[in-house]
Amino acid sequence: MSLPLTEEQRKKIEENRQKALARRAEKLSEQPQSAASGSSAAGPSQSKQGSLLNLLAEPSKPVGHASIFKQQNLSNSFPTDQRPHSSRCSQPSPAEETTGLWKTQGEMSTACPKPNPSPPGASNQPLLGYKSSEGQPQATWDTGASSSGPFPRDPELEAKAARPSTSRQSISDSFYVLGGKTPRTEGRPPNILQTTPQNTGFLRGACIKTGDRFRVKIGYNQELIAVFKSLPSRHYDSFTKTWDFSMSDYRALMKAVERLSTVSLKPLDEAGGSVGGQTSLPSAPSLTFVTGKCMLISRVRFEVDIGYSEAVIGLFKQMESRSYDIKTRKWSFLLEEHNKLIARSRELKQVQLDPLPKTVTLAFASQLEKTSPKLKADVPEADLSGVDAKLVSSLMPFQREGVSFAISKRGRLLLADDMGLGKTVQAICIAAFYRKEWPLLVVVPSSVRFTWEQAFLRWLPSLSPENINVVVTGKGRLTAGLVNIVSFDLLCKLERQLKTPFKVVIIDESHFLKNIKTARCRAAVPILKVAKRVILLSGTPAMSRPAELYTQIIAVKPTFFPQFHAFGLRYCDAKRLPWGWDYSGSSNLGELKLLLEEAIMLRRLKSDVLSQLPAKQRKMVVVNPGRISSRAKAALDAAAKEMTKDKTKQQQKEALLVFFNRTAEAKIPCVVEYILDLLDSGREKFLVFAHHKVILDAVAKELERKNVQHIRIDGSTPSADREAQCQRFQLSKGHTVALLSITAANMGLTFSTADLVVFAELFWNPGVLIQAEDRVHRIGQTNSVSIHYLVAKGTADDYLWPLIQEKIKVLGEAGLSETNFSEMTEATDYVHKDPKQKTIYDLFQQSFEDDGNDMEFLEAAESFELGSTSGTSGNISQDLGDLLDEDEGSPPKKSRFEFFDNWDSFSSPF
């Protein structure tokens, strides 16, 4: 097996091949003279040809593909020989053909010696020769010093043969094979020895003027690139892969090109001929086929993404609204010129320009006819005279615009306002506008079903509680009320009841429907297809993952993109892989956003409407009672009964302590669920206030299990460490939660980098709550602050919440407080009208009527909690999964957490 050749050997072999071809050209040039001289001149030449013919006709010689060689002109305008080394090494020279001293491919594998460095003057001399020694052919080195050889050498003829020829007629198109001719094959085998680029090809190019500069259109040439880099005004465009220069460097470039023997440039005036070392041949017309597409970049303009073409540039310059962006190097036009541009581009044979998608042209049909400079379409103000006056008068200006937008879209839209902008109240108002088409179906995450119930009762006084049906188990009736509220999970279990169509449907956290393969999506999509009004709510539309938006888009407007593949190609950067199509990417996001906002989507950020928002937005969140375990409910009932008995004042306080602690135990699963849902919804930084240690412990345990960064400040935190923990929170990035004690961290600390505060528990002193709220509502806060109070029915919250409101009202009348919970908080009147409620409320009020008793009660509460850690509260320290599994009468053995984003959507910020 032959050893691989070194780079030097390959180079010398290539030189030898060129020289052998030169000798053959010399021999062929002598043949016509021999034929003209007749038999008188046929002496040695005739004998040589006879020897060659005898050799070619001899059948006993071994024949391999090494015996095939091509007669070709030595023009540098064509690629050098690209045959494999084995073939080139075994090609016979003219001397070898006449003497018969040439070898087949197998023999030549050992007949090619390693070349020694040649002197500089020997570049045009044969490298390999053969001499006979003792009857055997041997490879010898011939430096050209002697004139020995079968043919006399003519230096002038060799130089002429070595010069590149520009005539195509001198090129032979035949292969000579042993025994005769065979037609030339189409392809040429690759040159496996040519590992480095060689500038042996002749390049032709042209200079093209573009404004005050000119660019050079030509192929790659190493020497030419060096010339380009020597010019000070050079600039390389990586997109078009061309060089351009200032006109001041034009003459210098042309002079430098004249010194290059393998490059020809057509001057700018196109009349001076080619500039270069060779005479230029007429170049064939360019057959470059360019393709491009149109993309929407604003409500009034579109952009063209296409490769360079002089014809296309000429077409662009015919458009009156043309505009060229120097940064992106793209042209844009008004929408009203879209159809004209597409029509004229079809007249260009080598250009294919794809128009805007049909969905886009339909959505912007008015702009295509006559482009309006307005950045937003005019939305007529809706007539809301048929909606409850309390609701209409409470709407902020931007919320009123949202309702009008929905009605202008005939009640089918995706409301994607930022968190905290009141999507719930807007959705209720939109649904109330179509009240004649009720019953209404509201599909929401399970933990906020009762929050929606309270919102309907608050904003629609004309709606009686009996007309609201909250489905809590899989056995409930989905059509029992005028307003039917159900969770996503229960909707899947009630598919049999969905035969009765709902004309008006609200889907809260509609991004739950991102995957068509999920059970909740399969259950919801048929409802949305037959519904007349579809109101989707989502605080964080997945604009970066367009594939997750597709289900929501077709739910609102089924005719938008009937086929997902077309949507995926345009907006998901679809790629075909060996196992199928990949739609996980994104493309043309700007166009998609403009399209959705024009047709179905309304999205406002807090920064857009900050001037209309109050400094604080309070929201009372009614947690899911299904999360409270039966054991906790029994303990609460027992504690409530104890409070109604005749007791001394000290015994009453002890009963209150028991009730207060049982409430903390019962709310643990609800609080943990809410915190995790906030994190999954995209909330990154917020505060969680609680009084009982068991709640802080439970939340901290879940955060650690989820690997969520958090800090904790309670009564056991040293004073020196509190400020350090605060700074850690302020400077942190990403998801961070601050777990804070209501009494230990309600003053002296600043958490202005957060704009959300969650109170896991209520406190009987509203002044302490307001101080805790102000940890984020401080100097340096640039956003509207959201305050969420988590309350649970059937617990101490039933009595603490009205007590807090009463105290705030008294302080406000005395001018000691500017806060009004009743007017600034959603869903305040949630409390059950229980006969024993008045007695318990009075007991709370009597116990806390004097603020001086607060500290005594706090100390007693803390002592009670510490003393009960080995008893009752031992039940709390059990695995949280046991507390969270009991839900809706059907306890599956898995986590029942719902993951959704925009808890602020349930509030009406007033």
Swiss-Prot record:
What residue intervals hold the motif Nuclear localization signal?
603-620
Give GO BP annotations, semicolon-separated. Answer: DNA damage response; double-strand break repair via nonhomologous end joining; regulation of transcription by RNA polymerase II; replication fork processing
> What UniProt keywords are attached to this protein's entry?
Acetylation, Coiled coil, Hydrolase, Nucleus, Phosphoprotein, Repeat
Modifications the protein undergoes after translation, according to the UniProt entry:
DNA damage-regulated phosphorylation by kinases that may include ATM, ATR and PRKDC.
Query: What class does this enzyme belong to in the EC scheme?
Result: hydrolase
Q: Where is this motif: DESH box?
A: 508-511
Give the modified residues of type Phosphoserine.
S118, S165
Q: Where is the composition biased (Basic and acidic residues)?
A: 7-29
Query: Which InterPro entries does this entry report, sorted A to Z?
Result: HARP_dom, Helicase_ATP-bd, Helicase_C-like, P-loop_NTPase, SNF2-like_sf, SNF2/RAD54-like_C, SNF2_N
- One Pfam family recorded for the sequence: SNF2-rel_dom
Primary location class: nucleus
Question: Quick one: where's region Mediates interaction with RPA2?
Answer: 2-29, 5-29
What's an example GO cellular component term for this entry?
nucleoplasm
Which transformation does this protein catalyse, written as a reaction?
ATP + H2O = ADP + phosphate + H(+)
| All copies of domain HARP, residue ranges | 199-269, 286-357
Annotated region Disordered: where?
1-198, 868-896
Please list the coiled coil stretches.
3-34
Q: Where in the cell is it found?
A: Nucleus
Homology family: Belongs to the SNF2/RAD54 helicase family. SMARCAL1 subfamily.
Name by which UniProt lists this protein: SWI/SNF-related matrix-associated actin-dependent regulator of chromatin subfamily A-like protein 1
Give the species this sequence originates from: Mus musculus
Could you read off the lineage of the organism from its UniProt record?
Eukaryota, Metazoa, Chordata, Craniata, Vertebrata
